[in-house]
Amino acid sequence: EIFAFISDTPLGSASIAQVHRAELLSGEQVVIKVQRTGIYEIMARDIGLLRKAVKLMPPISLKGMADFDQVLDELWNVTREEMNFLTEASNMEEFARRNADVVYVRTPKLYQEYTTMHVLVMEYIEGPAIDDKEKLLAGGYDLEEIGIKLIDNYIKQVMEDGFFHADPHPGNVKIQDGKIVWIDMGMMGRLTERDKELIGKAIRGIAENDIGMIQEAVMALGEFKEKPDQSVLYEDISELMSKYGSLDMGEIDVAEVMMDLMEVMKENKIRMPHGLTMLARGLTNMEGVLADIAPQINMIEIASRHISESMWKDLDWKKELKHAGKNLYRSMHKAVEVPGLAADALHGLMKGQTRVNLDLHASNDLAQLLRRLVRNVV
């Protein structure tokens, strides 16, 4: 009554669902995402086994490590969101609405009337994956232009919308008719206005080389059971600033910055909110895509432009002039030129990955269980 044709062979298959190509009676080409039978129970069982494994670990093995219960709670929450296709449908609609004015970006058309918690029907996208350089070049595309627009839009999702794709691997980004098409909205991240405000505060601290301001932002953003040693955190941030402060933006490696930031947060036992944890994953994927299709592009340079523009646009001039004076604005005007800005702009954006950056050497069995679960979730 709905489909004229459904392919028996799946276009793709993962632990949670399979995707089949189909044709509506109207002739429209679509894909059907069908959830695997019993997957909810299977995932719930796996999480339960992991919780039991954590309880069996000797207490000494947890010293200095992340809060496993919290990590498992986060994994379970993310998994449940992905298993509700109505949530993904809502994400698609919100993403399309927020990017309606971006002429080079789109998302597949959603067929809401055919979508349920366990079945999602959307437009079939005919086009190469964003990392298929051979097909893109054969189609006359400029890889550098694609890379710039990809990152520009992603930073817009993060800094302006506070609603971003949290799993932007190459299979989830295609090129069709000159546009970047974002697909698979099952895993999306959000940043609150407070998150963005505090990130902005950290950036301003970097622009002024004000380690205390950065530290205040980090403390306000982070979550911790015991208050970190302020002097140690200050010294760690100072050391990080000195490491990247002499580099040009184009010389800064995002992956290296992330590793350093994660280590600082881990050493100070600071965890980031869920949204920033998701952002860490997304930015890592973005860096990988860029390295493949246009390695000459530096993501931090593009991000810094957005950050600088956002700071100017969002400033409350009367309030800021009263409290900070004109020198603050001269400092922010130089934001793009400050080498340390880009490295630490990610301070508030990427350090959340420490929540899942676990040191599992104490238990190989648990490490294997976690790896298996993560593969299932992904």
Cite the ranges covered by each PLM segment.
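Conserved catalytic cores of large enzyme domains
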Residues: 1-378
